[in-house]
Amino acid sequence: MRGGLWQLGQSITRRLGQSDKKTIVRRCYASEADLKKTVLYDFHVAHGGKMVPFAGWSMPIQYKDSIMDSTINCRENGSLFDVSHMCGLSLKGKDCVAFLEKLVVADVAGLAPGTGSLTVFTNEKGGAIDDSVITKVTDDHIYLVVNAGCRDKDLAHIEEHMKAFKAKGGDVSWHIYDERSLLALQGPLAGSTLQHLTKEDLSKMYFGDFRIIDINGSKCFLTRTGYTGEDGFEISVPSENAVDLAKAILEKSEGKVRLTGLGARDSLRLEAGLCLYGNDMEQHITPVEAGLTWAIGKRRRAEGGFLGADVILKQIADGPAIRRVGLFSTGPPARSHSEIQNEKGENIGEVTSGGFSPCLKKNIGMGYVKSGLHKPGTKLKIVIRGKTYEGSVTKMPFVPTKYYKPA
């Protein structure tokens, strides 16, 4: 899981500062020739992007700015990320909502057209297969984006259940948007910058909203969402127009929005207290344990009907045995798999993500601890490279979120 980043050499790992190496580069391939490239690959290289293996793709981990500077600039101005390695797809048909509700915990039927939500795909034991942002475009059209590292298993899972659903007469079909690229524009200048490139009034578009609109002359799927805790958008654009759109965004921001890589993206999501699948969520972790009970709609709690509902609903009623928590710690930054102990030195859990916060100038992390030891202020110890350091449980997000919502 973490081996690929070590192969990059000490020059890059030093520039990564204190970020958790495992969370950045995953599922590396044997050679550069094995890696997929987004349509912006040459654009990244021309702008100084340092390309690394990530989930089978060659992606920029950073540009000329340090990861710390890029993180802070996103919070103060804005960042543009290439997230085309992620997989966008649509489900269509009069039964697409009923079909999706068998696989995810969200109240999809309760979403108004043009709105969306974070949700979790679950397995029969209630564990998380992946997390995803889903949008109800219309009552018979759902748009969703799944993680790059989970693409193959997610698509196989959806296809398997779709075949069974259709065999019983269900009306649902799907399309995978391999012909599109995905850009994420994040930060306080995201709205004003993008407004220069569309006639759509973005001030009326709030967090979680979705539109199909013209941006810079291209038909785009626009979602007001992101992975940083800041206001921002994810823009699905025809691949042949992706480079032109990236150039236009950077130009309209007058240099304040900067290209940003995976390193800062990881720092930003950690500061925002957001899960990284494969670290903070796995197939043996339920949404309740991960602190995502809020994503399980009220109707779904009453009716169930999704995979693993019996396990998940019992955890909601009785409480889970473990819980995801935020962590502060002394010493070097905690890493994934670092042991968490109580004050007596007894094992109570494990760190899943950790790093140095560029904005808070202190070590932060996430992990799982036994229920009862999850309350903010609980003192604990973290074992890093055989040495024990003081730590404590804290609330998340570490940095306040700034999602654009109605006043």
Swiss-Prot record:
The keyword Transit peptide applies. Substrate binds at E234, R265, Y403. The keyword Metal-binding does not apply. Transmembrane segments: none annotated. Residues 1-29 form a transit peptide. Coiled coil: none annotated. InterPro entries: GCS_T, GCST_C, GCV_T_N, GcvT/YgfZ/DmdA, GcvT/YgfZ_C, TrmE/GcvT_dom1. Its main location: mitochondrion. Keywords: Aminotransferase, Mitochondrion, Transferase, Transit peptide. GO terms for molecular function: aminomethyltransferase activity; transaminase activity. One of its GO terms (biological process) is glycine catabolic process. It is found in: Mitochondrion. Pfam families: GCV_T, GCV_T_C. The glycine cleavage system is composed of four proteins: P, T, L and H. PANTHER family: AMINOMETHYLTRANSFERASE, AMINOMETHYLTRANSFERASE, MITOCHONDRIAL. This is Aminomethyltransferase, mitochondrial. It comes from Flaveria anomala (Yellowtops). The lineage of its organism: Eukaryota, Viridiplantae, Streptophyta, Embryophyta, Tracheophyta.
